[in-house]
Amino acid sequence: MIVQHRTAPVTGSAHFAFTDRWGGVSAAPYGELNLGGAVGDDPAAVGANRERAARHLGLDPAHVVWMNQVHGRDVAVVDGPWGADAEIPAVDAVVTARRGLALAVLTADCTPVLLADPVAGVVGAAHAGRPGLVAGVVSAAVEAMVALGAHPSRITAHTGPAVCGRCYEVPEEMRAEVAGAVPGTWSETSWGTPAVDVTGGVHAQLAALGVTDRHASPFCTLESGDHFSYRRDRTTGRLAGYVWLD
Protein backbone atom coordinates (compact mmCIF):
# COMPACT_ATOMS: atom_id res chain seq x y z
CA MET A 1 0.00 0.00 0.00
CA ILE A 2 2.71 2.51 0.93
CA VAL A 3 5.65 2.82 -1.42
CA GLN A 4 7.64 5.09 0.84
CA HIS A 5 7.22 6.34 4.38
CA ARG A 6 10.21 8.23 5.67
CA THR A 7 10.64 10.28 8.77
CA ALA A 8 13.14 13.10 9.20
CA PRO A 9 14.81 12.44 12.60
CA VAL A 10 14.85 16.03 13.84
CA THR A 11 12.81 18.06 16.28
CA GLY A 12 9.19 17.93 15.16
CA SER A 13 9.68 14.96 12.86
CA ALA A 14 8.49 15.33 9.28
CA HIS A 15 6.81 12.40 7.57
CA PHE A 16 6.69 11.74 3.82
CA ALA A 17 4.67 8.93 2.24
CA PHE A 18 3.68 7.81 -1.25
CA THR A 19 1.14 5.12 -2.13
CA ASP A 20 1.15 2.47 -4.81
CA ARG A 21 -2.03 1.04 -6.36
CA TRP A 22 -2.50 -1.98 -4.07
CA GLY A 23 -4.43 -2.61 -0.87
CA GLY A 24 -7.69 -0.86 -1.67
CA VAL A 25 -11.25 -1.74 -2.60
CA SER A 26 -11.76 -0.08 -6.00
CA ALA A 27 -12.72 -2.28 -8.95
CA ALA A 28 -11.05 -2.22 -12.36
CA PRO A 29 -9.96 -0.01 -14.03
CA TYR A 30 -9.33 1.82 -10.74
CA GLY A 31 -8.04 -1.17 -8.82
CA GLU A 32 -7.21 -1.15 -6.13
CA LEU A 33 -6.18 1.84 -4.01
CA ASN A 34 -7.56 4.70 -6.07
CA LEU A 35 -7.48 7.88 -3.98
CA GLY A 36 -8.80 10.27 -6.63
CA GLY A 37 -12.39 11.40 -6.31
CA ALA A 38 -12.82 12.87 -9.80
CA VAL A 39 -11.88 9.99 -12.09
CA GLY A 40 -15.19 8.12 -12.34
CA ASP A 41 -14.68 5.66 -9.50
CA ASP A 42 -17.38 4.81 -6.94
CA PRO A 43 -17.22 7.59 -4.29
CA ALA A 44 -17.78 5.04 -1.54
CA ALA A 45 -14.73 3.09 -2.69
CA VAL A 46 -12.62 6.25 -2.83
CA GLY A 47 -13.70 7.17 0.68
CA ALA A 48 -12.85 3.71 1.97
CA ASN A 49 -9.47 3.84 0.26
CA ARG A 50 -8.66 7.25 1.72
CA GLU A 51 -9.55 5.99 5.18
CA ARG A 52 -7.43 2.86 4.73
CA ALA A 53 -4.39 4.83 3.59
CA ALA A 54 -4.72 7.38 6.38
CA ARG A 55 -5.14 4.74 9.09
CA HIS A 56 -2.16 2.83 7.70
CA LEU A 57 -0.08 5.98 8.19
CA GLY A 58 -1.45 6.66 11.65
CA LEU A 59 -3.45 9.65 10.45
CA ASP A 60 -6.99 10.76 11.16
CA PRO A 61 -8.71 10.71 7.73
CA ALA A 62 -10.61 13.85 8.72
CA HIS A 63 -7.31 15.70 9.12
CA VAL A 64 -6.00 15.16 5.59
CA VAL A 65 -6.21 18.17 3.26
CA TRP A 66 -6.87 17.39 -0.41
CA MET A 67 -6.77 19.77 -3.37
CA ASN A 68 -8.85 20.45 -6.47
CA GLN A 69 -5.87 20.23 -8.83
CA VAL A 70 -5.99 22.17 -12.10
CA HIS A 71 -2.40 22.25 -13.45
CA GLY A 72 -1.79 25.81 -12.23
CA ARG A 73 0.47 27.56 -9.71
CA ASP A 74 -1.95 28.79 -7.05
CA VAL A 75 -1.26 27.86 -3.43
CA ALA A 76 -3.64 27.51 -0.48
CA VAL A 77 -2.37 28.25 3.03
CA VAL A 78 -4.41 26.19 5.49
CA ASP A 79 -4.63 25.76 9.26
CA GLY A 80 -7.19 22.97 9.30
CA PRO A 81 -9.17 20.59 7.12
CA TRP A 82 -11.79 21.89 4.72
CA GLY A 83 -15.27 22.09 6.20
CA ALA A 84 -17.70 19.31 5.35
CA ASP A 85 -19.68 21.59 3.03
CA ALA A 86 -16.78 23.75 1.87
CA GLU A 87 -15.87 24.00 -1.79
CA ILE A 88 -12.29 22.80 -2.19
CA PRO A 89 -10.37 25.56 -3.98
CA ALA A 90 -8.71 25.06 -7.34
CA VAL A 91 -5.04 25.00 -6.35
CA ASP A 92 -1.99 22.90 -7.10
CA ALA A 93 -0.11 23.43 -3.87
CA VAL A 94 -1.03 23.64 -0.23
CA VAL A 95 1.07 24.62 2.79
CA THR A 96 0.51 24.67 6.53
CA ALA A 97 2.17 25.46 9.83
CA ARG A 98 -0.27 23.23 11.71
CA ARG A 99 1.37 20.15 13.20
CA GLY A 100 -0.63 16.96 12.78
CA LEU A 101 -2.41 18.24 9.68
CA ALA A 102 -1.52 16.08 6.67
CA LEU A 103 -1.36 17.55 3.16
CA ALA A 104 -2.09 15.29 0.20
CA VAL A 105 -1.40 15.49 -3.53
CA LEU A 106 -2.90 13.22 -6.22
CA THR A 107 -1.01 12.03 -9.29
CA ALA A 108 -0.95 9.43 -12.05
CA ASP A 109 2.20 10.50 -14.00
CA CYS A 110 2.65 14.08 -12.78
CA THR A 111 5.29 14.64 -10.12
CA PRO A 112 4.11 14.85 -6.50
CA VAL A 113 6.32 17.21 -4.48
CA LEU A 114 6.44 16.99 -0.68
CA LEU A 115 8.29 19.66 1.30
CA ALA A 116 9.03 20.11 5.00
CA ASP A 117 10.98 22.43 7.27
CA PRO A 118 10.64 20.69 10.66
CA VAL A 119 12.51 23.47 12.47
CA ALA A 120 9.99 26.11 11.37
CA GLY A 121 7.14 23.62 11.61
CA VAL A 122 6.01 24.18 8.03
CA VAL A 123 5.13 21.64 5.33
CA GLY A 124 3.90 21.82 1.76
CA ALA A 125 2.63 19.59 -1.03
CA ALA A 126 2.56 20.44 -4.73
CA HIS A 127 1.21 18.87 -7.93
CA ALA A 128 3.82 19.40 -10.64
CA GLY A 129 2.60 18.38 -14.05
CA ARG A 130 4.25 19.86 -17.11
CA PRO A 131 1.95 22.94 -17.23
CA GLY A 132 2.21 23.61 -13.50
CA LEU A 133 5.96 23.18 -13.54
CA VAL A 134 6.29 25.77 -16.30
CA ALA A 135 3.81 28.06 -14.54
CA GLY A 136 5.95 28.00 -11.38
CA VAL A 137 4.02 25.91 -8.88
CA VAL A 138 7.22 24.64 -7.23
CA SER A 139 8.59 28.11 -6.53
CA ALA A 140 5.13 29.29 -5.45
CA ALA A 141 4.94 26.49 -2.88
CA VAL A 142 8.40 27.23 -1.49
CA GLU A 143 7.65 30.96 -1.34
CA ALA A 144 4.44 30.28 0.58
CA MET A 145 6.38 28.14 3.04
CA VAL A 146 9.00 30.86 3.47
CA ALA A 147 6.22 33.34 4.25
CA LEU A 148 5.27 31.04 7.15
CA GLY A 149 8.83 31.00 8.50
CA ALA A 150 10.52 28.20 6.55
CA HIS A 151 13.97 28.59 5.03
CA PRO A 152 15.01 26.81 1.81
CA SER A 153 18.24 25.56 3.39
CA ARG A 154 16.21 23.66 6.00
CA ILE A 155 13.60 22.24 3.63
CA THR A 156 13.64 18.53 2.85
CA ALA A 157 12.01 17.66 -0.48
CA HIS A 158 10.72 14.31 -1.70
CA THR A 159 9.36 13.72 -5.20
CA GLY A 160 7.26 10.61 -5.70
CA PRO A 161 6.53 8.14 -8.47
CA ALA A 162 6.03 9.90 -11.82
CA VAL A 163 6.51 9.31 -15.52
CA CYS A 164 10.24 9.47 -16.15
CA GLY A 165 12.15 11.48 -18.72
CA ARG A 166 12.88 8.33 -20.71
CA CYS A 167 9.14 7.71 -21.21
CA TYR A 168 7.42 11.11 -21.36
CA GLU A 169 7.39 11.57 -25.13
CA VAL A 170 6.40 15.01 -26.46
CA PRO A 171 6.70 16.91 -29.77
CA GLU A 172 10.06 18.53 -30.42
CA GLU A 173 8.54 22.01 -30.18
CA MET A 174 7.10 21.27 -26.75
CA ARG A 175 10.41 19.91 -25.48
CA ALA A 176 12.17 23.07 -26.62
CA GLU A 177 9.53 25.30 -25.06
CA VAL A 178 9.56 23.52 -21.71
CA ALA A 179 13.36 23.26 -21.57
CA GLY A 180 13.62 26.95 -22.37
CA ALA A 181 11.42 27.77 -19.39
CA VAL A 182 12.69 25.11 -16.96
CA PRO A 183 16.31 23.97 -17.17
CA GLY A 184 16.73 20.30 -16.41
CA THR A 185 13.67 19.09 -18.30
CA TRP A 186 15.22 18.39 -21.72
CA SER A 187 15.21 14.65 -22.30
CA GLU A 188 15.02 11.88 -24.86
CA THR A 189 12.95 8.71 -24.73
CA SER A 190 14.63 5.32 -24.57
CA TRP A 191 13.58 4.89 -28.21
CA GLY A 192 15.21 8.14 -29.31
CA THR A 193 12.39 10.69 -29.58
CA PRO A 194 11.93 14.07 -27.82
CA ALA A 195 10.87 13.90 -24.18
CA VAL A 196 10.43 16.01 -21.07
CA ASP A 197 11.75 15.14 -17.60
CA VAL A 198 9.31 16.84 -15.23
CA THR A 199 10.91 15.43 -12.09
CA GLY A 200 14.31 16.62 -13.31
CA GLY A 201 12.82 20.07 -13.76
CA VAL A 202 11.34 20.03 -10.27
CA HIS A 203 14.71 19.22 -8.75
CA ALA A 204 16.44 21.87 -10.86
CA GLN A 205 13.97 24.47 -9.63
CA LEU A 206 14.35 23.35 -6.02
CA ALA A 207 18.12 23.55 -6.32
CA ALA A 208 17.88 27.07 -7.73
CA LEU A 209 15.69 28.03 -4.76
CA GLY A 210 18.31 26.77 -2.31
CA VAL A 211 16.73 23.44 -1.38
CA THR A 212 19.65 21.02 -1.16
CA ASP A 213 18.14 18.10 0.78
CA ARG A 214 16.26 16.46 -2.09
CA HIS A 215 15.15 12.88 -2.74
CA ALA A 216 13.50 11.31 -5.80
CA SER A 217 11.48 8.11 -6.11
CA PRO A 218 13.02 5.51 -8.42
CA PHE A 219 9.61 4.49 -9.83
CA CYS A 220 8.38 5.47 -13.28
CA THR A 221 4.59 5.30 -13.25
CA LEU A 222 4.33 4.45 -16.95
CA GLU A 223 6.75 1.52 -16.64
CA SER A 224 5.55 0.21 -13.27
CA GLY A 225 2.48 -1.99 -13.05
CA ASP A 226 2.34 -1.16 -9.35
CA HIS A 227 1.38 2.44 -10.06
CA PHE A 228 -1.42 4.26 -11.85
CA SER A 229 -0.48 5.93 -15.14
CA TYR A 230 -2.81 8.15 -17.13
CA ARG A 231 -0.53 8.11 -20.16
CA ARG A 232 -0.53 4.31 -20.18
CA ASP A 233 -4.14 3.53 -19.27
CA ARG A 234 -6.18 6.76 -19.63
CA THR A 235 -9.06 5.63 -17.42
CA THR A 236 -7.32 4.80 -14.16
CA GLY A 237 -6.92 5.71 -10.50
CA ARG A 238 -4.74 8.20 -8.67
CA LEU A 239 -1.82 7.75 -6.31
CA ALA A 240 -1.28 10.05 -3.34
CA GLY A 241 1.62 11.66 -1.56
CA TYR A 242 1.26 12.77 2.06
CA VAL A 243 3.39 15.08 4.20
CA TRP A 244 2.88 16.07 7.84
CA LEU A 245 4.66 17.02 11.06
CA ASP A 246 4.25 15.43 14.48
UniProtKB/Swiss-Prot annotation:
InterPro entries, sorted: Cu_polyphenol_OxRdtase, Cu_polyphenol_OxRdtase_sf, Cytotoxic_necrot_fac-like_cat
Enzyme Commission designation: 2.4.2.1, 3.5.4.4, 2.4.2.28
Catalytic reaction list: adenosine + phosphate = alpha-D-ribose 1-phosphate + adenine; S-methyl-5'-thioadenosine + phosphate = 5-(methylsulfanyl)-alpha-D-ribose 1-phosphate + adenine; inosine + phosphate = alpha-D-ribose 1-phosphate + hypoxanthine; adenosine + H2O + H(+) = inosine + NH4(+)
Keyword ATP-binding: no
Keywords: Copper, Hydrolase, Metal-binding, Oxidoreductase, Transferase, Zinc
Pfam families from the UniProt entry: Cu-oxidase_4
Domain of life the protein comes from: Bacteria
GO molecular function terms attached to this record: adenosine deaminase activity; copper ion binding; oxidoreductase activity; S-methyl-5-thioadenosine phosphorylase activity
Cofactor(s) annotated in UniProt: Cu(2+); Zn(2+)
Binding-site residues, Zn(2+): H71, C110, H127
Family according to the record: Belongs to the purine nucleoside phosphorylase YfiH/LACC1 family.
Biological role stated in the UniProt entry: Purine nucleoside enzyme that catalyzes the phosphorolysis of adenosine and inosine nucleosides, yielding D-ribose 1-phosphate and the respective free bases, adenine and hypoxanthine. Also catalyzes the phosphorolysis of S-methyl-5'-thioadenosine into adenine and S-methyl-5-thio-alpha-D-ribose 1-phosphate. Also has adenosine deaminase activity.
NCBIfam families from the UniProt entry: peptidoglycan editing factor PgeF (TIGR00726)
Quaternary state and interactors: Homodimer.
Protein's name in the database: Purine nucleoside phosphorylase ORF3
